[in-house]
């Protein structure tokens, strides 16, 4: 990165058209990878895409990690278009991140070991994974830690 690139960030010479810079991000995509040929096909489809810096493929976890200045939906569309394989954004996160990893909407048998379904993208599932306000009220009503709790017991 030269001096001209550094100085051009401070001055806008575009004459009305604004160019939005994409940020460097990591995109995880779930793709069914059966063999080394499938792995090579996915890698070649992504390496030709503009803005991609690194492609890492984990065939056992059915996971492709892309690092670069790209949009996640464009990466998924490129994999689907070029390879003909079904692809989606990686729906699993490590179980340490989720508050209730064994709730009915979060736990998934098809998830790799140590991962559960991401509740951030599906609001219906996330509602099941959290305790409701009435549920919290009932559990704290008889708590020893609550000073204004009921002393029936």
Curated annotation (Swiss-Prot):
The HMA domain, residue ranges: 24-88
Residue numbers of Cysteine methyl ester PTMs: 150
GO molecular function: metal ion binding
Cellular component, GO annotation: membrane; plasmodesma
Signal peptide residues on this chain, from the entry's feature table: none
Lipidation (S-farnesyl cysteine): 150
rRNA-binding recorded as keyword: no
Location within or outside the cell: Membrane
Top-rank taxon, per record: Eukaryota
InterPro entries linked: HMA_dom, HMA_dom_sf
Propeptide section residues: 151-153
PROSITE patterns linked: HMA_2
Keywords: Cadmium, Lipoprotein, Membrane, Metal-binding, Methylation, Prenylation
Residues holding a metal cation: 35, 38
Tissue: Expressed in roots, shoot apical meristem, trichomes and flower buds.
One Pfam family here: HMA
Function: Heavy-metal-binding protein. Binds cadmium. May be involved in cadmium transport and play a role in cadmium detoxification.
Similarity comment text for this entry: Belongs to the HIPP family.
Name of this protein: Heavy metal-associated isoprenylated plant protein 25
Origin species: Arabidopsis thaliana (Mouse-ear cress)
């Amino acid at each position: 990165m030269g001096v001209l690139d550094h100085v051009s960030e401070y001055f806008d010479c575009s004459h009305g058209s604004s160019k939005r810079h994409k940020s460097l991000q990591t995109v995880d995509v779930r793709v069914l990878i059966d063999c080394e040929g499938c792995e090579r096909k996915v890698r070649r489809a992504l390496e030709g895409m503009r803005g991609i810096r690194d492609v890492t493929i984990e065939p056992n976890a059915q996971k492709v990690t892309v690092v670069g200045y790209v949009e996640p939906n464009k990466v998924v569309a490129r994999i689907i278009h070029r390879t003909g394989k079904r692809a989606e954004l990686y729906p699993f996160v490590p179980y340490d991140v989720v508050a209730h990893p064994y709730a009915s909407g979060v736990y998934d048998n098809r998830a790799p070991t140590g991962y559960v379904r991401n509740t951030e993208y599906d609001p219906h599932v996330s509602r099941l994974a959290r305790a409701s306000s009435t549920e919290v009220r009932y559990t704290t009503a008889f708590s020893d830690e609550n000073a204004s709790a009921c002393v029936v017991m």
